[in-house]
């Protein structure tokens, strides 16, 4: 943001602050970031579609009025989603890279530009990460790697459920390394983007450029690495990328929703390499950590939230950080839209749909076994037995598949629940049913029916 635009925006904010409540100001107006101003049009960046809709319908006229007071001119206001702007920026960067194709080094290698580092989220730093018992080990491992890249643990493999902070730690590592060494070549990418770039490289006959891009870096961070499983060409390419970086003593950081040994259809040679360094897990946050996360979020966003409301949220939302912070924002939005103070009663109203779903009976391996046994007119003991006749073996595989899909239980634990079977048996069952689901409509219907009954109890 240039100085003139910044000054204009700050003056407008001071006017608006006196016209609406503190909650509304902090929730909606402060979420805007000015992008540019020209031809009597002010362009503002907003975080999501919901916020965009509220600003457009409730606060647009107020923004226009404030700008008129400051500048004596009438401006139009245009709102843009941050995600759209990021995509536009990526496209611009891609075009720049394409223009550089003919100006690469003599050996044809691509120099990783500073723009690659721009893919890191500025909000995801070690300073903004809330440490608790559930993530202390993963945080310590990440900090050790950031302080001594390729010397502490290589690779670092972080795993855990959705929304628990894996991506936050990966970005924090990248930021820390760049802060200590601005010339470091740090690349963060999702496994999906890695795969898509590989596909495009093959299609456009640019394999060498693709390899140079990922093999001539100091730090490679790949998120959701489990998604390369089952993709033979991607696994082949990443295997050689991993080897090239490791041999050159470059740092590799990977994240996944499960440990390497539990990723189905992952090649053994990759699985073993993922286990070369340190494997660190992140568990769902305990109550104290959930409270700390909520207080941190409230402080950062400038929100005045009573302690008893945060206790209520932390008691009701236990699964992950994303849902926890989302619940807080939902309550603040509900307060602003209904023009009521934030209270436990208001929080209960705002979260009633979310909480009612959360408090339904959890799906367990036992409930899955009961449902599958009832469907096939079997006993649970049959599913746990060592019998391998098809009328028992196939329902057992279905129950194992559902256990992997609908519970957070590890593969070895699932195997134990089915008569002490090995985790590889569970992987085989999961892969077989997954494959059959692609063509067997009867199986699809049955799986959907059982899943619906289990999740709506």
From Swiss-Prot:
It holds the Pfam family DnaA_N. It is found in: Cytoplasm. SMART domains: AAA, Bac_DnaA_C. GO terms for cellular component: cytoplasm; plasma membrane. Residues 119-335 are annotated as: Domain III, AAA+ region. SUPFAM superfamilies: P-loop containing nucleoside triphosphate hydrolases, TrpR-like. Its main location: cytoplasm. Residues 336-457 are annotated as: Domain IV, binds dsDNA. Residues 75-118 are annotated as: Domain II. GO terms for biological process: DNA replication initiation; regulation of DNA replication. InterPro entries: AAA+_ATPase, Chromosome_initiator_DnaA, Chromosome_initiator_DnaA-like, Chromosome_initiator_DnaA_CS, DnaA_C, DnaA_dom, DnaA_N_dom, DnaA_N_sf. Oligomerizes as a right-handed, spiral filament on DNA at oriC. Belongs to the DnaA family. This is Chromosomal replication initiator protein DnaA. It comes from Clostridium perfringens (strain 13 / Type A). The gene is dnaA.
């Amino acid at each position: 943001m240039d100085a003139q635009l910044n000054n204009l925006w700050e003056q407008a904010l001071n006017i608006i602050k006196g016209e609406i409540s503190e909650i509304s100001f902090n929730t909606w107006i402060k979420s805007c970031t000015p992008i540019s101003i020209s031809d009597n049009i002010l362009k503002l960046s907003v975080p999501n579609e919901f916020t965009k809709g509220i600003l457009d319908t409730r606060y647009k006229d107020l923004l226009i009025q404030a700008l008129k007071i400051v500048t004596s001119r009438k401006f139009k206001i245009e709102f843009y989603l941050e995600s759209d702007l990021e995509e536009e920026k990526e496209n611009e960067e891609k075009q720049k890279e394409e223009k550089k194709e003919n100006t690469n080094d003599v050996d044809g290698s691509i120099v990783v530009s500073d723009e690659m580092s721009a893919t890191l989220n500025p909000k995801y730093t070690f300073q903004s990460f809330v440490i608790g018992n559930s993530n202390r080990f993963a945080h310590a491992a990440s900090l050790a790697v950031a302080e001594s890249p390729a010397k502490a643990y290589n690779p670092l493999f972080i795993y855990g459920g959705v929304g628990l902070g894996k991506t936050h730690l990966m970005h924090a590592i990248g930021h820390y390394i760049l802060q200590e060494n601005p010339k470091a070549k740090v690349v963060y990418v999702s496994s999906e983007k890695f795969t898509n770039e590989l596909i495009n490289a093959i299609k456009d006959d640019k394999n060498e450029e693709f390899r140079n891009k990922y093999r001539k870096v100091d730090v490679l961070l790949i998120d959701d690495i489990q998604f390369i499983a089952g993709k033979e060409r991607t696994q082949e390419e990443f295997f050689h990328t991993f080897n090239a970086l490791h041999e050159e003593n470059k740092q590799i950081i990977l994240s996944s929703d499960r440990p390497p040994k539990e990723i189905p259809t992952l090649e053994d040679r990759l699985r073993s390499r993922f286990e070369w360094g340190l494997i660190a897990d992140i568990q769902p946050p305990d109550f104290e950590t959930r409270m700390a996360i909520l207080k941190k979020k409230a402080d950062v966003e400038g929100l005045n939230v009573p302690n008893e409301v945060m206790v209520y949220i932390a008691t009701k939302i236990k699964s992950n950080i994303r849902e926890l912070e989302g619940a807080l924002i939902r309550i603040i939005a509900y307060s602003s839209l209904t023009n009521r103070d934030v209270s436990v009663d208001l929080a209960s109203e705002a979260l009633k749909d979310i909480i009612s779903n959360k408090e339904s009976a959890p799906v367990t391996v036992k409930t899955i076994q009961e449902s599958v046994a009832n469907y096939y007119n079997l006993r649970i003991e049959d599913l746990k037995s060592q019998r391998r006749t098809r009328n028992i073996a196939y329902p057992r595989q279905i129950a194992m598949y559902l256990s992997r899909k609908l519970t957070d239980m590890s593969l070895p634990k699932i195997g134990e629940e089915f008569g002490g079977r090995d985790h590889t048996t569970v992987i085989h069952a999961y892969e077989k049913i997954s494959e059959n689901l692609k063509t067997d409509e009867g199986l699809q219907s049955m799986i959907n029916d059982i899943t619906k009954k289990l999740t709506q109890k």
